[in-house]
Amino acid sequence: MLEYYDDDAYVYDDDDEDAPITAEDSWTVISAFFREKGLVSQQLDSFNQFINYTIQDLILEDSTLILEQLAQHTTEADNISRKYEISFGKIYLAKPSMTESDGVSHAMYPQEARLRNLTYASGLFVEIKKRTYEAVDIPGRDLKYEIIQEESEDTEEGKIFIGRVPIMLRSKYCLLDDLSESDLYRLKECPFDMGGYFIINGSEKVLIAQERSAGNIVQVFKKSAPSPISHIAEIRSALEKGSRFISTLQVKLYGREGSTSRTIKATLPYIKQDIPIVIIFRALGIIPDGEILEHICYDQNDWQMLEMLKPCVEEGFVIQDRETALDFIGRRGTALGIKKEKRIQYAKDILQKEFLPHITQLEGFESRKAFFLGYMINRLLLCALDRKDQDDRDHFGKKRLDLAGPLLAQLFKTLFRKLTRDILRFMQRSVEEAKDFNLKLAVKATTITAGLKYALATGNWGEQKKAMSSRAGVSQVLNRYTYSSTLSHLRRTNTPIGRDGKLAKPRQLHNTHWGLVCPAETPEGQACGLVKNLSLMSCISVGTDPVPIITFLNEWGMEPLEDYVPHQSPDATRVFVNGVWHGIHRNPARLVDTIRKLRRKGDITAEVSIVRDIREKELKIFTDAGRVYRPLFVVADTQHADGHKDLKVRKGHIRKLMLTEYQDIEGGFEDEDINYTWTSLLNDGIVEYIDAEEEETILIAMQQEDLDPSVPQTVDPSDELDPARRIKAIHHSNTFTHCEIHPSMILGVAASVIPFPDHNQSPRNTYQSAMGKQAMGVFLTNYNVRMDTMANILYYPQKPLGTTRAMEYLKFRELPAGQNAIVAIACYSGYNQEDSMIMNQSSIDSGLFRSLFFRSYMDQEKRIGMSITESFEKPHRTNTLRMKHGTYEKLDDDGLIAPGVRVSGDDIIIGKTTPIPPDAEELGQRTAFHSKRDASTPLRSTENGIVDQVLITTNQEGLKFVKVRVRTTKVPQIGDKFASRHGQKGTIGITYRREDMPFTAEGVVPDLIINPHAIPSRMTVAHLIECLLSKVAALSGNEGDASPFTDITVDGISKLLREHGYQSRGFEVMYNGHTGKKLMAQIFFGPTYYQRLRHMVDDKIHARARGPMQVLTRQPVEGRSRDGGLRFGEMERDCMIAHGAAAFLKERLMEASDAFRVHICGICGLMTVVAKLKHNQFECRGCKNKIDIYQVHIPYAAKLLFQELMAMNIAPRLYTDRSRDF
């Protein structure tokens, strides 16, 4: 329980290679998985796929630009037509590099990009060929073109630069890929940094996986009462590669249950009305009624379904041939007033290109599309006849996650289109003006560079012009607060539904989420359940080409759809690949077995999913990108005599894995070179990837013991009955096909840190998952060479005493975020009520929970106009306008502050001036001497510290650029926030010195005292078990294993604690620190891991007397950073009204805010009085009134409102009680 490995873990007696594996061995498999995949493999694989294949595909898709220049026939000789053609070929990607302002290029490493605010990107080059054709244009004959010249561009074998693509760190094209640890140290990179993000203008950006519904699947839904449609079947067809161009087809069943004519109509794209389905079938060339019904209803004896189709056949009775049907559809098109032939062609085009485009967009596949439409109607009717439930929108197998690859592909496609359009325009201009066509000038490389950069920098995914329509928040700044918060951010997924939607369904945890997304880690509040996090072992498919699989199916007895005659083969199974119905098969069981064998051998990619629905007689194969899958152990088919089955994985495999791992660490043994990795397991068919769809066709055992039916039933009589032991469910089945590698792998990054999460009430784990991301620790080991905007580093981080096995892969022991505090659970003076706690001041003085805080300030000399720039210098009052009120004395002459200088609020740390253009007046403050204006950066007014580091460099334009880092030590004090790993957060209520704290008989004094009332209502039992286990761990000198779903019991831990001579449940006798008397009750006492959270009282404290005012309303400004006021809001106002405290109310809302004096005319009641206060003369010119004038005090905001109303021709007249009656 406490020790992970014996000392001789790698030394085996030569026992049976074929022995079954133990629970410990499954962790070896998990280690192999993470050693090969890492925690951000989904990001890296997706990006690699994009660079390796997608870009080339997208460029070849739009590869040829053609421009024809027809003969003008102005003179006899002018009868030559020309055709210009430009075609794109192979692409080349350079290494990430940068070009300095003086034109020198060099390789760029990520750290340089971060410090100099550059973009880590690689140049993209493409081969471009130009061809020119000519033809003699003889009227009445077709043109015959001949090539007259063909040239590749000579620049380096015809490679043209078309833009820079940002490179994901640690991907295949990153300079850090496959570097050793020492190389990384040399480049000032942290070896723990896992990559998976981009560097754009110096800031680290992650692409959050975007969840969407999968395309190309038929879904049937019921519609609720007021709608005339009772059921609807819909499919969102999307072409496999490229544009994600989506065309939706809906088949609607009109008429509610029990109504007479329940017709079925379909909504076609670009057609204004719904078209009866029989007409669509006839337009597809299927004329006889019987044949149409055959396409829909596969069983000719199913009279119920045929009965439902009767009204449809009757409805389409009028139209009996293909032409008429096509004309019927064409008439309802968007284009009006066109001839019949045109209409028919229009309808044909729509049926070919827009109707079910995912099947094909070529002509001659009408039969396939007809069968598919029939299948949709069949599904619709099955649901209407209550033989099948409606589809579940929230089924995770019907969702796809778009990662960096698909997201960038979508963007790249748009930008490349734009680029080709520009080239075409340039060609046209060149041809018209008979200029030389220069490719270098035609290709605007900034289109792609700037487009990708903009999307990644702002998170608005789409073109800059259409910023409103595009999705926001796709790219986010990587959270660098703690190492685990970074990891968690890289594995986050987002569902783009409106956050304000009150729909509960998409937010709920669904059964199909098991093992794929974490059940605990989701934010509270408006994004709850919409933002999810991947479980530790889940991966996302990158998408593979379905063609080999389709070829294989055709060879293995799949009959093509065109030859399918339903009534002849009623038992045939329909075969779908990526939602396209390709054909039927008569022996599906054998086919599925064969494909599975191929997949387990590695002949078919492991990420392909194979789903056989026996009841529906369907076989679905998915190879598309964005499916979430996870690995499982495969159970061997052979059944033993006693009915149990074995896992395919045996002790021998585990040994090979361990030897490989040992080689990696120790350098291995000379004699044998074993390289047995996770991939080897996959290719040996020992583990298998299963996605949410396929998971429903298999049976998964939770532990290895479940496979053996003889184990749970027989209770060993020698065991004394342990009341605390976990109760195992008795299985009534032994047809398992798979087994979980370990159930704790259902959790995500943040929840894997929680000890015993299976002993907590579920929302507590969710709270901790959110708080763990705010804990201080060491976010990366190279924090000293980074200039982050903000960074918090704990002085003495400790690894927890109660650990989970998953922490190994989260590197939590190497980069922890907390300390093991000695905690007593007691009231003791009552300064820990309501989630506050008492902390030991002496421990704080020794450095408990101290932290460093770094903040960086950045500035650069900007260009103004062509020649003039701002300059860093120490401004002088003599020649500089608008100087700030902080002190400039700490600056050196170059305008920068030296490291080691102590600074406090509002001190200037970067001095900079801007030249004033000679014609500017500067509000009359300017004298002859003033030639510049101050543009310096002061320290934040509420902070102080020591200047830690100053960096001077130049940016891409070659302008001077500085970053200054200020360092502060934050010592825990009253009001700072802490939390255990169970959602038990609290602030310090008081600190006592050691002599005032209670102590145990051994003289141990706690660091923290928390209130016992924090435990019962919150049911965080794991908090107590962790404390108990940590106590044992501290006494025995081992780490305590607090992983979820193990056989560890409180009794087991209590026994161990007893053996160390302590009270078995962790209680101790304590003495009052003030009086020395024994405390009445025994106190629960032991170490618990606590985290210091980022909310500190020094960053929150705020008060104000008088201060800055808003310009428009003259009310106090808002916000602590601007020294703003405290809002007396509507609710506070209501309380004052309820109390009847009128004078106080007037003081708060007027005197303390924006009191203002106006003069009003007693006659007209308007504020039109001209007041000369010096001479005591007043006059309302409109009324010629000089005597009847009153002075009133009203809020300035009210005066403003009155004036704005007057601007809208509404006259608010103010009357005093002394003005005359109107």
From Swiss-Prot:
Would you tell me the protein name for this molecule?
Answer: DNA-directed RNA polymerase II subunit RPB2
Its subunit composition reads: Component of the RNA polymerase II (Pol II) complex consisting of 12 subunits.
| PROSITE patterns xref list | RNA_POL_BETA
Write out the residues that bind Mg(2+): 835
The record makes one more remark, namely:
The binding of ribonucleoside triphosphate to the RNA polymerase II transcribing complex probably involves a two-step mechanism. The initial binding seems to occur at the entry (E) site and involves a magnesium ion coordinated by three conserved aspartate residues of the two largest RNA Pol II subunits.
| GO CC annotation terms, alphabetical | mitochondrion; pericentric heterochromatin; RNA polymerase II, core complex
Instruction: State the organism named in the record.
Output: Eremothecium gossypii (strain ATCC 10895 / CBS 109.51 / FGSC 9923 / NRRL Y-1056)
PANTHER family linked to this entry:
DNA-DIRECTED RNA POLYMERASE I SUBUNIT 2
A GO molecular function held by the record: RNA binding
Which family, according to UniProt?
A: Belongs to the RNA polymerase beta chain family.
NCBIfam families documented for this protein: PRK09606.1
Q: Name one Pfam family in it.
A: RNA_pol_Rpb2_2
Q: Where are the transmembrane segments?
A: none
Note the superkingdom of the native organism. Eukaryota
GO terms, biological process: siRNA-mediated pericentric heterochromatin formation; transcription elongation by RNA polymerase II; transcription initiation at RNA polymerase II promoter
Q: Which reaction does it catalyse?
A: RNA(n) + a ribonucleoside 5'-triphosphate = RNA(n+1) + diphosphate
Which segments does the record annotate as C4-type zinc fingers? 1161-1183
Record gene name: RPB2
- Give the enzyme class: transferase
InterPro entries linked to this entry: DNA-dir_RNA_pol_su2, DNA-dir_RNAP_su2_dom, DNA-dir_RNAP_su2_hyb_sf, RNA_pol_bsu_CS, RNA_pol_bsu_protrusion, RNA_pol_Rpb2_2, RNA_pol_Rpb2_2_sf, RNA_pol_Rpb2_3
Main location per UniProt?
nucleus
